[in-house]
């Protein structure tokens, strides 16, 4: 009985905090609810930095891991942000996938788009014409990979870059897993939690425009 009695106040406080997530400015409830509830249940994010108590800040940051930047608002631990800060949709993280399967990606993106996804194709030349402005990378890119030149042959000029957007918001871990399961070559995860899987014909990192139907903000 004692463990149950001990857990009741914790569960009540967690449920109260989760119910108020959508009221917290900047809190992405769709992305953060699961991880935040896990960390709260472990008692790792329950101190109050705004009241001068940051005794749990380090443990909370480690618990939220790669979602810290996106979810710290949900636990009241983000530094105050300027209204002039760039929106999350303008920031993204990219990574090359270890074992792409081009034939699988093409098969899944030809014809009608799968449920809960949107397939977009555009010229490779258009993909390479934009200067990348990424906030972070999951891997180190050497100087040569950052200075990509436009293709010169007419065949490459006519090539299309095909990408897939998932309709709903997902975590960066889910984004990587989904794109790997589709045989994608790379992925781009926008900091508003929109996921873009990038096909084998793309020479850079696809489009830097958010087009996830239910995850546009």
Swiss-Prot record:
It is found in: Secreted. Pfam families: Tsg, Tsg_N. GO terms for biological process: blood vessel development; regulation of BMP signaling pathway. The keyword ATP-binding does not apply. One of its GO terms (cellular component) is extracellular space. Residues 1-26 form the signal peptide. It comes from the Eukaryota. The keyword Membrane does not apply. Glycans are attached at residues 53, 147. Transmembrane segments: none annotated. Keywords: Developmental protein, Glycoprotein, Secreted, Signal. Its main location: secreted. Involved in dorsal-ventral patterning. Appears to function predominantly as a ventralizing factor, through its actions as a BMP signaling agonist, acting through both chd-dependent and chd-independent mechanisms. May also antagonize BMP signaling, probably via formation of ternary complexes with chd and BMPs, resulting in dorsalization. Belongs to the twisted gastrulation protein family. PANTHER family: TWISTED GASTRULATION PROTEIN HOMOLOG 1-A-RELATED. This is Twisted gastrulation protein homolog 1-A.
């Amino acid at each position: 009985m004692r463990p149950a009695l001990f857990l009741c106040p914790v569960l009540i406080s967690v449920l109260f905090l989760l119910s108020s997530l959508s009221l917290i400015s900047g809190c992405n409830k769709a992305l953060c609810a699961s991880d935040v509830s896990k960390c709260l249940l472990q008692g790792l994010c329950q101190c109050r930095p705004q009241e001068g108590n940051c005794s749990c800040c380090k443990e909370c940051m480690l618990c939220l891991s790669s979602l810290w930047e996106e979810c710290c608002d949900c636990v009241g631990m983000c530094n105050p942000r300027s209204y002039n800060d760039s929106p999350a949709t303008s920031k993204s993280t990219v990574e090359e996938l270890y074992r792409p399967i081009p034939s699988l990606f093409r098969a899944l993106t030809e014809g009608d788009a799968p449920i809960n996804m949107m397939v977009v194709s555009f010229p490779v030349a258009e993909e390479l014409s934009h200067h990348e402005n990424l906030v972070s990378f999951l891997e180190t890119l050497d100087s040569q990979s950052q200075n990509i030149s436009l293709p010169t042959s007419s065949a490459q000029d006519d090539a299309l870059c095909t990408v897939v957007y998932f309709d709903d918001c997902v975590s960066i871990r889910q984004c990587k897993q989904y794109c790997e399961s589709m045989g994608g070559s790379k992925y781009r995860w926008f900091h508003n939690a929109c996921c873009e899987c990038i096909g084998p014909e793309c020479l850079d990192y696809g489009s830097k425009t958010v087009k996830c139907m239910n995850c546009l903000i």
